[in-house]
């Protein structure tokens, strides 16, 4: 079938993570590949009760079309929570409900990018964002990062030489894939540059409340110059991803563009889903659920780190995240993580090769590990299997 496709389709590929997940469907495979929340944290019974209440008391509205911006009580609840927990000063009129924060990424590309424009991003960065933006045919310029976040001097150098930089995409808290969190100094430095060069910052914040230890750091959206920040949030990592509920917050002029794009894309996010979540937040709040997520993921992270320390051969380094769902491993440069993955799959264990997280390629000796999904017993066994493969590869 010879259908003539749009030029942008040449840049789109299946998500590498999704392709790997297909290989891990066998129950015996211990997968550190996906970014899946632990299903045992989903409050299914409570949601069932809330759903019954919503449908019995307000069924016609829950099953009807609703405003593009979102269900007003949910927008208010999100604004209140952002202001109380994150130190922002947003109004509910600045909250747009999206079908997961992934939709916010797609809308950002649609609004801000013409072919050939430049996206500035961390190196490495979230694979889902790379794929979302690629549809709009940009160039990616990767900014150097270290344990404290984006290197401000490198960002300044790039901004000074790139006239068509359209936005800076960042994940400052428990970054996917590295697990690192930006220091306050780095956050302020990036905001200073955003104001000076008048370039928007897209702050993707799925994990900020999943902190195991250490002090929380204010989001960019709470700092001076926050009118330049588009904040993307989601309930997928702290509630449940199947409802596909996220949000964004932006300054009024840009916010209205997101509303127009949302209208064209899907009119609005599921009314029933929004009312389910609003009812849950009103009845139970979110703190209890988040604490359960934190306690579970902390224990799983600890087992992964402890087993890696005991079993991995010399010459391998990794990050030690204070929260979130991922850590990042750097192998000796002589090793290729894709080749190691093939060997690990024979041992029924999987991860994501790190090269997928660099939009311009390279860095094939890196990989991402997820600790949120598997039990502590399976994490320990899976890391031991990986260690066996790595020892053989290094020898």
Regions found by a protein language model. Give the residues of each.
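PLP-dependent enzyme catalytic core of the Aspartate aminotransferase-like
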Residues: 1, 346, 359-395
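N-terminal small-domain helix-loop-helix segment of the aminotransferase-like
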Residues: 8-100, 107, 282-283, 350, ...
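Conserved PLP cofactor-binding pocket of PLP-dependent enzymes
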Residues: 29, 206, 210, 345-368
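Conserved core of the PLP fold type I
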Residues: 61-198, 202, 208-226, 297, ...
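Conserved core segment of the aminotransferase class I/II
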Residues: 225-295
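Conserved glycine-rich beta-strand-loop-beta hairpin in the small C-terminal domain of fold type I
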Residues: 278, 291, 295-305, 317-330, ...
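Short, conserved charged micro-motifs
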Residues: 335-340, 377-381
